[in-house]
Amino acid sequence: MTSLSSYALTLRGRDYSPLIVGGMGTNISTAELGLAVEKLGGISHLSDAMLMDVSDRLFGTRFTAAKAKRYAGLRDAADKSAELFDLDAVREATIRYISNVMSKTTGRGLMLINCMEKLTMNSGLDTLKTRLNAALDAGIDGITLSAGLHLSSFRLMSEN
């Protein structure tokens, strides 16, 4: 009889169930969905889109409110070139979320994060570097890159 395990995906000598879910979008690939797939030995993706907002909603942090307050004067401005992400806040939100999810994994599957490179705004390289390395520092199993592979992505993670 053919079963799901008959179609195992082997990566680096380890078999995974051919269950692969997740991707882009703010918390569409929720931790609960990802953990269910990982528990079955599959490969799951979380999204790193708007993790400061996700952190605010899940953990009661105030990253989004702080950013809105800091740049309130630019709210109606056409030129938002002075608006930057607080990289310490980006790092803290990413580490908080990923660490929380990774503490609940079983080790049967993989938990990846999908990093949407085009989400960056001003100071894009610094923002991308912070997001990539914070996810790795928090223990994510791997990173997938979408919405445009940044040519510097691997260099940005070279110390990790």
Residue ranges of model-derived segments:
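Active-site entrance/lid segments in N-terminal catalytic domains of soluble metabolic enzymes
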Residues: 1-160
